[in-house]
Amino acid sequence: KTQMDLSWYNIYVAHKCFEGDDSLLYKNYYDYLLENRICAYTLPYDTAGYYTDERILQYLNNPRVVAFNPIAWKKDADADRVRAAYKFLSQNPAWMEKSYFYVVDEPTDKASLDRVNAVGEVLKENFPGYKMMAPEHVNYALNKDSTADNFSAVQNCINVWCYKPYFYTTFAEYRYSSYTPGQKLTYW
């Protein structure tokens, strides 16, 4: 499955379209990606989790759409919005299968990790069977005396992992120094 950001703002600024066009420009970009088997996080005609525009059904029912963010990218995952999304999407198991929450990008500091967990609690209470991802590009210890790391800090809420191959190779300098005591420089 593929997902990527497709920024409404950047599209409309690049085209100097400031008066609105009923989402046509965004839809054209989204459709181009979809033709090439790439799904953007936010569906055309998305209403941030409330699903009030019936034109969105053409995307929810499209077999090429394999993933989307149920509340749209960069929208608050408050309980009302999440409940509304669940109420609508749970009408069709295929829509639920395509639903992936992505609300915090690359959480690395305490505030962003706490935000992941806070959203996770909202999802647990209001969107049964939720799938939430958080791209992890590094994995740090939570503090210098801790064996806990970013991964462990959010493991109770994240259930779709997006990591880089070196995500699990943590604390490289420390680990390598134990194999090469006294050596100042190591290549790998």
Feature names for model-found ranges:
Residues 18-23, 41-52, 73-81, 108-113, ...:
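Acidic-and-aromatic substrate-binding clefts and catalytic sites of carbohydrate-active enzymes
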Residues 1-75, 90, 94-98, 105:
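An acidic-aromatic substrate-binding cleft motif
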Residues 2-9, 30, 119, 123, ...:
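Generic ordered-secondary-structure signal
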Residues 30-34, 52-68, 81-96, 123-127, ...:
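Acidic (Asp/Glu)-rich catalytic clusters
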Residues 43, 97-146, 158-166, 184-188:
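Aromatic-lined carbohydrate-recognition surfaces of secreted/lumenal glycan-active proteins
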Residues 3-20, 148-169, 175-188:
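Long, low-complexity, intrinsically disordered polar/charged segments
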